[in-house]
Amino acid sequence: MDRVTRYPILGIPQAHRGTGLVLDGDTSYTYHLVCMGPEASGWGQDEPQTWPTDHRAQQGVQRQGVSYSVHAYTGQPSPRGLHSENREDEGWQVYRLGARDAHQGRPTWALRPEDGEDKEMKTYRLDAGDADPRRLCDLERERWAVIQGQAVRKSSTVATLQGTPDHGDPRTPGPPRSTPLEENVVDREQIDFLAARQQFLSLEQANKGAPHSSPARGTPAGTTPGASQAPKAFNKPHLANGHVVPIKPQVKGVVREENKVRAVPTWASVQVVDDPGSLASVESPGTPKETPIEREIRLAQEREADLREQRGLRQATDHQELVEIPTRPLLTKLSLITAPRRERGRPSLYVQRDIVQETQREEDHRREGLHVGRASTPDWVSEGPQPGLRRALSSDSILSPAPDARAADPAPEVRKVNRIPPDAYQPYLSPGTPQLEFSAFGAFGKPSSLSTAEAKAATSPKATMSPRHLSESSGKPLSTKQEASKPPRGCPQANRGVVRWEYFRLRPLRFRAPDEPQQAQVPHVWGWEVAGAPALRLQKSQSSDLLERERESVLRREQEVAEERRNALFPEVFSPTPDENSDQNSRSSSQASGITGSYSVSESPFFSPIHLHSNVAWTVEDPVDSAPPGQRKKEQWYAGINPSDGINSEVLEAIRVTRHKNAMAERWESRIYASEEDD
């Protein structure tokens, strides 16, 4: 293709055989007209140069008396070995093959000078009118040799055309002569990119096993060297220089290619000039030719192999290489092998570590302290698997005085806690309660007629407590039946954890201990018990029962001390109400101690309130118990004063502020939604 005019040089109609040629790279060829005097007549190495007579006549047509031979150089500097550097001294003149005449189909061809050369250059134009038919035949032969010389090898070595006498028409296929130009050296194929891409993919699949074998071996061995390497399944017409060339059947195409190559006359035989710039040597005739993409793949793979050898890496066996990065696990105790991929809901490693430690702590607690005092499983279940009820965070495992039922498998030494002995609780318990009896099994208040099977069930390590034990501090369900079966204590029975208002009522001090002794607790029979099974008992844990009794005794003691103090200070004020059982008890107790009626202690100078108020009798009215409880709830507290308290009622009425309401708001509250004026 001409660089300036963009016309295909090979589009000349006479050159229809050369249309399959591909022109590598820059298709503008530079021709040096080398001076061929009689002293420079021997161009061949061995044979002398002899010109035919009509050729000498053709030389006479040209204006200088020297003979010219054509050298073709493809897009690179001229070989330094052939010519000296001084162009002007030797009188070289550079010409370019004009493509315009060739494209217009004229039988003549022109040698045009390049633009950048000296002004000394002369333009030689060989017109058809100047030459006779014999000269035209010679010119045609020369032009055909030039076109043949343009089929240069891909390794961009220089092909020099050298003349030898031959009169035969080059188009007539004579006996093929052996020339240095083999058909696998000449690359005549136009690049078909779709075919090349498919060939590239098939090469990749073929070379997966051995990636460093040269890609040329992946081509089928049956393809003839002259034939195109594009897949033959595509019967589209080939593109040659932008023109569609119909593909002949394959065998004929191969024969034509052979004729085209081997029918070069000997005076236009192509000789490969050794160029120091050209790297690739002549390929051996056995290897099939290589497409450009294959060559790029091969070079890239060789480059990668060289880099691997330099850096000491082993050969890549596969395209997907797995690189192992040595890591150190964060937590060596946790085995994360079961969950290799992190799920979204999975906790972090530290949370997992805490969970593991908590579970371990629960296990140790359960191993240490499955004690008798809890809800023991019946012994007909005790052979089965242990129920999943945990006792992890309760203080009962520490406070329980029972011996370790599972001392056979000891817990870690760190988690062993010294138990608080039950004798330490004894001074704090109320004097009316009997001494704590701790049987060998640690069951509180258990009847001595307990059978050995039930004792075994009580001491079995399977005994666990319901997880509701934290809300029920005594370990007993808060039911009225259970409270009814409980023996009455000295103070009115309250819901546990709730301080009743009766604790702070002003009453005289009682000094009477409860008469009846502490009864053993009657076990309650629940409705869900199996008929054939032994009774499933819910028993209080000893430690929680100790805490409960201590709390009740402390409350009772506080109440008694408060009443004693009030009674000593203001004896006339507090007249007990006769309607309560506890008040009858307290009155009888105060009568028994001889503190009845009004009295004043005038001897002691420290009781000044009694001196002041000794002659005045104040009475405190208890809240009216006859009112239903719903009505008492309706009375609102005002300014922090309980309206059910009879003392403060007058003060409350005195300081109560009447609400100032809008008239419309009052009508709205009295459900008068429309005024009379609107009607």
From Swiss-Prot:
Q: What is the effect of changing residue 395 to D?
A: No effect on cortical localization
In-chain residues carrying the UniProt-annotated modification Phosphothreonine? 164, 172, 179, 219, 224, 287, 377, 577
Biological process (GO) annotations held by this record are: cell division; cell migration; establishment of centrosome localization; establishment of mitotic spindle orientation; mitotic spindle assembly; organelle localization; regulation of protein localization to cell cortex
The protein's predominant localisation is other
**Looking at the record, which segments are called Disordered?**
151-182, 206-245, 360-419, 447-494, 557-598, 622-643
Name the domain of life. Answer: Eukaryota
The record lists the effect of residue 471 to D as:
No effect on cortical localization
**Which sequence ranges are marked TM in the entry?**
none
- Gene source species: Homo sapiens (Human)
Please state what the protein is called: Mitotic interactor and substrate of PLK1
